[in-house]
Each structure stands twice: as structure tokens, then as C-alpha cells.
Amino acid sequence: MAAQTAPELAKLDLNKNSGSAEANVVSNGGSDKDDAENEGDSDDDKDEAGGSAEVNTEKKKKKKRSKKKKKAAKVQSSPPRIPLTTLFPNNAFPEGEIVEYLNDNSYRTTNEEKRHLDRMNNDFLTEYRQAAEIHRQVRQYAQKELIKPGATLTDIAEGIEDGVRHLTGHMGLEEGDSLIAGMGFPTGLNINHCAAHYSPNAGNKVVLQHGDVMKVDFGVHVNGRIVDSAFTVAFDPVFDPLLTAVKEATNTGIKEAGIDVRMSDIGAAIQETMESYELEINGTSYPIKAVRNLNGHTIGQYEIHGGVNGKSVPIVKGGDQTKMEEGETYAIETFGSTGKGYVRDDMETSHYAKVPNAPSVPLRLSSAKNLYSLINKNFGTLPFCRRYLDRLGQEKYLLGLNNLVSSGLVDAYPPLCDVKGSYTAQFEHTILLRPNVKEVISRGDDY
């Protein structure tokens, strides 16, 4: 999910100087019991010793013939419908990419105290790794089967979200079920100049075209541990430099991130990488600009933007001197554009989230009161979109929803767009700043 830069920072003059491709195969190791029977026939005409030897020989032969039957290895279905805990019955979910700390923090890798602190976070890591593996399996299915020219955005979004719900084992139709595990951020399908926060509302008929550049941004959570990750799809190779620039910029941000690293240093490195690329369309070259008012961000439990003490990770130089700290979780995301490199609110809103720790506000509309109660019980502070309300059987809720927004109880996140005619791209990963190593929890073979 994109975090916006404060307006005063966005206005800075920046022109002077940017696991696993397939579902893991798991053998359950189950074995069938030997069914061999001891059938040694006695021969009255033979002596006892000879008969015994013959029986023993027959037993050995039968034992050799009786082989253990192997159960078929379990793999994820297509579409993904097998809960991840079935594929990983011992909850031994795959690690993300493990990166050792460098320079002044290199001691953390072998420091016994730091390793002990890390081992204390076992439940935290298990929940994050489960969410990350679900994200990998669903997104790789989406890339192969859902995201194609001619597909509707609604079909793509619902295909992704259905996969996430099945793999978590929580369909979210019962009160509170979505809070156990499920969608951590609604599926954003942002086309061309639209950079973030666009998801199809009910009745949307938009069809993906061959010449489109689409950002796919969604989150998965287990017990509020949100994995926020995004990628960009383009079918025309003319857009490859744009995708490469943004992917490399994100990887630069991940490489630079670490304990005690200043946000300003990360932003400068990201911008330098991204803006070393350009895109040529029909003989015209377009410099690729970092979108200066979009940022990465901390992630808190059940809070996509890390709560009141959340931090932002700029993608341009000139940011503040705030440092990253041990134990924090970050979404490192970058956006590149062939336009102005600045986004504004545009189009119909689909994304919303309850404001954490909002003050008590008297609500006069009964529709707003009822809707707020439903949001609390089903989403808490997790972001949601209008389709999720439709799915829960809500009708004619817009008046109440707008009242909650105007009352300061719910935040609306309109789509964020650069100028029309431009193209934008996004790549994003979630990283954990563990005491002894940095883990890129959402890393996969795809990006």
C-alpha cells in the first residue's frame, strides 16, 4: 500500500540532481502398514527342521515383496484452494530472503544475545512466513492464469482474493473471521497513469488491454501480521525499461535498509537508481522519475501504515534523518513514472480503513452506526474496499460510509494518479528488521 508524502516535503525541488515460483511440494511421510501374512505351509512328510527353514525362507520372500506405498505429494491446486497449513502441517513455512547486516551491524549475525532475542520471536516469524507464502502462491497463480489481456479487473481482483481466503482457511463471511487471517490490503489494480489505491467497485466493467501497464498490490495477514507486496505487469516489451527501473530501485531500497540507517540515505539511493533509466515510446524518450509524494512505510499489527508512530521511507533525496530501528517491519515500495512524478487524488474511491484510536464521535445516522459496528467486528483497522461490504450483504451503505469519513472515524484512500497519458510502475516487498538478520519476507522467484 502506498503512503503519501506530506505536501510540504513533496514540493521540494528535486530536479537539480532514482519463496518460490511454484507451490512447495510437501510429502506427508505417511506410510502404510505391512500387510504380509505369515502363511508358511507345513509338510508332514518333511522333517521339522526342514519345514521350519522353508517357512522362514517364504517369510523373507514375502517381506521383500511387501513395499511401503508412497502417498502422492501434495501440491497447491489451480486455482489455489488448499489451505497452506495442509501443505505445511508442521507450520514450517519457507523463510524469506535472509540478508546479513553489514558494516557496524555485522556483529549482529553471530551475537548470541541477538540470536536469543530472535528465537523469542518464533510465533511472529511463523505468522509472517505463512502470510508471505500465501502471497507468493496466489500472486504466481494470478500471473499465470488471471492477468491476461481481455480479463476484467473484477475477475482478477476476486480471483486473487478468493485464493487468499482459501489458503488462510478463513473465508471472512462469519463475524470476526477476517480478523483471524485473510486479506491484509484490498487488491489494487492500477492501470497506466494510476499509481495506487484503485480497486474495481461493484459494476466495474474495465477490461485489461495489451498496451496497459498494471500495478498489482495486495496484502495478506495472519493474526494481523500483514505482508504487503506489489508487482507490475506489462505485455508490451517497450515498457521493460520502466519495470526494470522500478524493480531495481526497490531492490536498492531493500539493500540500503537496516538498523540505524537514515531514511534520507535510503531515499537518495532509490532515486539515483530509478532515474538512471529512461523509456522510449515511438521514438520519443521519457525520463523515468521517482514519484516524490509516495513512500514506503512501517507496518504494525493490523495497521498497514504502522500506527501513530509509523515512519515513512522516501523514494527521493531530501528526506528526514529518522533512523530505522531493530524489530520494525517495513514495506519498501517504489514508484516510477513517465509523467510529472507527482500523484493526486482522482477517480472513484474504493479503499477505506478505520482510523486507529479515533475519538468517540456521536453518529446521528443509524446507517453509519450500523456500518461502523460491522467494520469494527469484521475488519478492525485492516483496510477494506466496497466489494468487501457487498460480500457481507450490505446495501445502500454509501451515505453511512461517507458520514463515517466526514466524522473522522474512517479514512478514505482515493486512487492516486499522475497526469493522463503517462505510465507508472510499482514494486514492493515487506522486510523484517530482525535482531540478527534482515529478512525480505515476501521475496519470491518472480521478483
Swiss-Prot record:
Signal peptide annotation: none
MF term (GO), any: metal ion binding
Binding site residues for a divalent metal cation 1: 217, 228, 428
Bias-annotated ranges (Polar residues): 15-30
Cofactor(s) required, per the database record: Co(2+); Zn(2+); Mn(2+); Fe(2+)
CDD domains: MetAP2
Residues noted as binding a divalent metal cation 2 in the record, renumbered to the chain: 228, 297, 333, 428
Keywords recorded for this protein, A-Z: Aminopeptidase, Cytoplasm, Hydrolase, Metal-binding, Protease
Name assigned to this protein: Methionine aminopeptidase 2-2
One Gene Ontology biological process: proteolysis
Bias-annotated ranges (Acidic residues): 34-47
Family statement drawn from the similarity comment of this UniProt entry: Belongs to the peptidase M24A family. Methionine aminopeptidase eukaryotic type 2 subfamily.
Naturally occurring in which organism (per UniProt): Arthroderma otae (strain ATCC MYA-4605 / CBS 113480)
Principal EC category: hydrolase
Subcellular location: Cytoplasm
Catalysis: reaction(s): Release of N-terminal amino acids, preferentially methionine, from peptides and arylamides
Purpose of the protein: Cotranslationally removes the N-terminal methionine from nascent proteins. The N-terminal methionine is often cleaved when the second residue in the primary sequence is small and uncharged (Met-Ala-, Cys, Gly, Pro, Ser, Thr, or Val).
Enzyme Commission (EC) number: 3.4.11.18
A GO CC term assigned to this protein in UniProt: cytoplasm
InterPro entries for this protein: Creatinase/aminopeptidase-like (IPR036005), Met_Aminopeptidase_Type2 (IPR050247), Pept_M24 (IPR000994), Pept_M24_MAP (IPR001714), Pept_M24A_MAP2 (IPR002468), Pept_M24A_MAP2_BS (IPR018349), WH-like_DNA-bd_sf (IPR036388), WH_DNA-bd_sf (IPR036390)
